Amino acid sequence: MTTASDAVVVGGGPVGAFAAWNLSKLGVDVTVFEEHAEVGVPSHCAGHLSIRGLKTLGLDNLPRGIVENTYSGANVYSAQGTKFSLRMRKPVTCAVNRALFDKFLIERAKKTGASVSLNSRVKSLVVKNGFVVGVSLDQKSKGENQSEAKVVVDCEGISSRLVRQAEPAALSSQELVYGVEAEVENIENVVSDEVGVYLGKDYAPGFYAWLMPRHDGSAKVGLAATRGNPKELFQRFLSKHPVASKQLSKAKVTQMTFHAISLGGPIRKTCANGFLVVGDAASQVKPTTGGGVIFGLTCARIASEVVAEAVRRKDFSSVCLEQYEDSCRSSLGFDFRTMLRARRFIYSLSDKKIDSALRFSSRFKLDEAMKGVDEIDLQGQMLVKALSKPALFAGLAYFLLLYLTTNP
């Protein structure tokens, strides 16, 4: 059996759902294929999103129950337990229930005309005369078949199977960390509107651990690392970290998931004839924090506009679709490059140097200089603005001094 649409979206996660929603609003006949029986399950993301980012995307008035908490502060802890605290003037980030958030987006896509097919695993791209013209499917209710499309929008996530088929050289920039996230009850000594960030090569080498509290004493707790077994690192973090071990001494883990995160910045090529890749599959993920939802949604909106124009012009060549790549690079390229350099710099420092940096930041009251910050997604642009403040400029100079000195 063969079906046909203007566009096929592979993956019903937030990026795929948002792409389909925007495509259908622009009059494009679109079908979403989601391999799972239910959208949003299983969840592979903490759901820690910037409030400003959501507002920019028109998602600031989410239905009741999706937003689990908002955060006005953050505490960064070194491996030795030194704390640097930030307190903003208003909530800057929020925690969303990812299952409900994903369902909200897919329902909006359906209401604007998108078709959604669950239990539908896309096996491969269908290619004719150098153009992607559809997908080959394995559907639980219908067996194996194909769906024709003028454009395939790949939002399948980090597995990137289809990217390898369409543009095998595109993935060379991927840098992966491997993470674990848990739902935890009975946390202690935590302010409910402040997130925790925990550094240390014995607990999360090459990345960090996090704690996102809720008002009821539960939290999302996780970590990611470039090496080591995530589950073993997580147990060590719970029991040995000088701060987290006290906050989580009575904690009960009720659920645990494992996932990889791509931190190398966007892949080199995000389009081919009849094909676009968006979100985690394109590594459109913040290299500093591993957050990919806001950037993925931003790129999904750009992709939908480019695809709608391609449908109008009846031109599905890579030359036409490259407008998507150019627009994403123009909007986010500087921030990606800045964040990638910042991550490599920070994680090149020893635990002792990071501890010294946090002590310096507290001593020179860098928290006061950062109180007005509300932009956490476009971190390159945020850094440029920050350099106009003497205290933050001094802080950056100190970090550079740490990097250049040879003493551990």
Features from the language model and the residues they span:
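Beta1/beta-strand and adjacent pyrophosphate-binding region of the FAD-binding site
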Residues: 1-15
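Predominantly flavin-linked oxidoreductase catalytic cores and closely associated redox partners
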Residues: 108-248, 283
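FAD/FMN-dependent oxidoreductases across multiple families
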Residues: 124, 229-306, 312, 318, ...
